[in-house]
From Swiss-Prot:
UniProt function note: Involved in unsaturated fatty acids biosynthesis. Catalyzes the dehydration of short chain beta-hydroxyacyl-ACPs and long chain saturated and unsaturated beta-hydroxyacyl-ACPs.
Family: Belongs to the thioester dehydratase family. FabZ subfamily.
Reactions the enzyme catalyzes: a (3R)-hydroxyacyl-[ACP] = a (2E)-enoyl-[ACP] + H2O
Superkingdom of this protein's organism: Bacteria
TM annotation in the entry: none
E.C. numbers: 4.2.1.59
Class in the EC hierarchy, top level: lyase
Chief localization: cytoplasm
Record gene name: fabZ
Keywords, sorted A to Z: Cytoplasm, Lipid A biosynthesis, Lipid biosynthesis, Lipid metabolism, Lyase
Protein name, entry field: 3-hydroxyacyl-[acyl-carrier-protein] dehydratase FabZ
Catalytic residues as annotated in Swiss-Prot or TrEMBL: H57
Any one GO molecular-function label of the UniProt entry: (3R)-hydroxyacyl-[acyl-carrier-protein] dehydratase activity
Amino acid sequence: MTNSPSSPVVLTNEEIMGLLPHRYPFALVDRVVEYEPGKSATGIKNVTINEPHFQGHFPGRPLMPGVLIVEAMAQVGGLIVKQIPDLPKGLFVFAGIDSVRFRRPVVPGDQLLINCELISIKRQRFGKVKGEAKVDGNLVCSGELMFSLVD
């Protein structure tokens, strides 16, 4: 983790890979620009035409699938849940979504700025995070994401 006394903690792609199990083509967070372990995180996803889903979604009018926007939000949220002190070590998996709304399309060339904040932890096994994804300051997706510890 890179930081100085006056700057927020940031994570490089390599550091993210040390915390999350996702790998290409499903690693959807390029870097983290703000990170308070166990509390909040802001990540960036650079959307490029080279991503495999754009071949069929949709030819001639490529749009990032909404489920992948939600997954990118979940990966940023996973960074928060993964670093909560005193939680058992193990694999936290995406377990559910509530109140997800899509506001505008995301296209190649966009940069998603994803902000997530911890809402709650229950029984040291279940986490809930509030997430928002924006492009150029405009909200494109928001919702609540749930995580569960897998034995």
